[in-house]
Amino acid sequence: MATGTQQKENTLLHLFAGGCGGTVGAIFTCPLEVIKTRLQSSRLALRTVYYPQVHLGTISGAGVVRQTSVTPGLLQVLKSILEKEGPRSLFRGLGPNLVGVAPSRAVYFACYSKAKEQFNGVFVPNSNIVHVFSAGSAAFVTNSLMNPIWMVKTRMQLERKVRGSKQMNTLQCARYVYQTEGIRGFYRGLTASYAGISETIICFAIYESLKKYLKEAPLASSTNGTEKNSTNFFGLMAAAALSKGCASCVAYPHEVIRTRLREEGSKYKSFVQTARLVFREEGYLAFYRGLFAQLIRQIPNTAIVLSTYELIVYLLEDHAQ
């Protein structure tokens, strides 16, 4: 009975710690997520730029103007949002994000912890294969449950309204999706989210390996008390940032495909069809639009989430003892 009670307390602890970590990270990095989503969208306005070229071999020596299209960068999108929509638009989608991030992180970390317990009994305990299967299982469950909320969040982030005009709130956006697309509309982009499980697996495999290395490092064993806690905390932040950065670079294209699938009235119908269409119309570089904003957002966000999670687990477990 005591063992069952202890397992229940551990699950609640991971739920609470994961929820707190996700909430803190979402608030701090919301503006960058809005910019990233705008950059990923097919509706991002391409600026036409004219480059003059002088051909000296011509009789008149006249210049020839070459036309090309340039994708706006992070700072240009930020400037456009501030000028046309106001600073509040940088926090579009924060409502559903806060509604969803705490339960999603809570479910994820609880599933991850539970799955790791199960897989430790099948494979070599705490090996990389355990972390891979645990992260993949947790991501699958979380994506399946939370996709409707993330769908609404993406729609709100893509909505463009001039400064001072009324924008849809979370409930209005959800109602509009239901009226125009039905229940299936809330699950657009889910296949891309499943493809993105590879990012989660890569991230946690690297993170757990780095965390194990930090525990065994000579510096960690030679310090004591407050100094050790501080070293561990910043070490975990660095490990989280590095693991997420590597994973994002490898698996980023699925994010662009997911955003395209969630656009209102879009021509994108399925994961494979969207990938082919984006490649044919825009080239392979389109799959990495917004990557810089993603790295700027996700690296500190993941560092905040994982470090807050580890800190709360450490403090509460230490307090319980």
UniProtKB/Swiss-Prot annotation:
Gene3D superfamilies: Mitochondrial carrier domain. Solcar repeats lie at residues 9-118, 126-213, 231-315. It is found in: Mitochondrion inner membrane. InterPro entries: Mitochondrial_sb/sol_carrier, Mt_carrier_dom_sf, SLC25A33/36-like. Keywords: Membrane, Mitochondrion, Mitochondrion inner membrane, Repeat, Transmembrane, Transmembrane helix, Transport. It holds the Pfam family Mito_carr. Coiled coil: none annotated. GO terms for cellular component: mitochondrial inner membrane; mitochondrial membrane; mitochondrion. Mitochondrial transporter that imports/exports pyrimidine nucleotides into and from mitochondria. Selectively transports uridine, thymidine, guanosine, cytosine and inosine (deoxy)nucleoside di- and triphosphates by an antiport mechanism. May import (deoxy)nucleoside triphosphates in exchange for intramitochondrial (deoxy)nucleoside diphosphates, thus providing precursors necessary for de novo synthesis of mitochondrial DNA and RNA while exporting products of their catabolism. This is Solute carrier family 25 member 33.
